[in-house]
Amino acid sequence: MQTPQNYLAVIKVVGIGGGGVNAVNRMIESGLKGVEFIAVNTDAQALLMSEADVKLDIGRETTRGLGSGADPEIGRRAAEEHRAEIEEILKGADMVFVTAGEGGGTGTGGAPVVAQIARELGALTIGVVTRPFSFEGRRRASQAEEGIQELKQSVDTLIIVPNDRLLQISDETTSMLDAFRMADQVLHQGVDGITALIVTPGLINLDFADVRTVLSNAGSALMGIGQGAGDDRAEEAARAAISSPLLEASIEGAKGLLLSISGGSDLTLHEVHRAAEAITRAAHPEANIIFGAVIDDALGDECRVTVIAAGFDRAAEASFARPALAISARESDSIRLPEDDDEDIPVPSLLKERQEDEDLFQPAQVGAGRNDEGDDDLDIPDFLKG
């Protein structure tokens, strides 16, 4: 008689390039559990500083461990050279996250290669990437768009973080390093929001099969994470999750929804109902809604809601700006939300249509007085490059 075994989903997070490895480091520092961390880079020195479980320096023959020089083609070739090693590292994974900062060399060129290998191995493959700040220059922005389109073909689901939106919810004293840390934090919340649905035992269980149902071959997806406290904590958390200033599009029209509500042991059925109702009202009437509830006494009197929306109609997607990851609309240590009287910063609302105004995507003035013709020459420190 065979001994019964408990089978847990194997989740691996691959950070590739400077931005991806930085994001992985932040996830490790934040105590993200239940996943294996893998750092991949052409910059051997930066790789040494990572606390990832597995480290792989790629492109040794091409770059001699000195980085890709912000050239995506070098990043792609470096990953291809080590295809067999990447495949060995990813074997056995049920889900693979590929995280990177788009616009540089290693992340932009190498992420599609890693994602392709993961899918060939049968893993549910999720891309979580950043679109660069405008102050990083037109060339980097152009490379990022090309990289995003290529990565989209290699993953099941792609979540994009628009870095310029981080400037809209920060103040003028935010340093460049703090801006990049904010981007890392959002990448972390993107991965944490999905893995928590799987690895945290639930009062109403959400398992890996549920996540696969919504995210397999889903294309672009939206994700929101919100927290609330007080009498209306669950509904407040739900509204925060779907109305973050970082959210570039509404979840309206989503035909696949993953909804997870976490709270203390005093979480009531009515609270759960109100939170779910606030979100499902915005979704497609025939949406496939998969729901989970988790009791986590560590939250105290707070409630946390995680929403993943996918399966948008192609026609609807064409009218949206590119989807993005949303984080809680509550103020945190590293991300400061705008004051109530700050009317210059647009905050999307569940109850009103988002205005399609190009000015929404313009960042706060950074480096005023800089010669615009030379913005491609902006020197980003090596450890921040992809």
Model segments located where?
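Tubulin/FtsZ superfamily GTPase core signature
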Residues: M1-G386
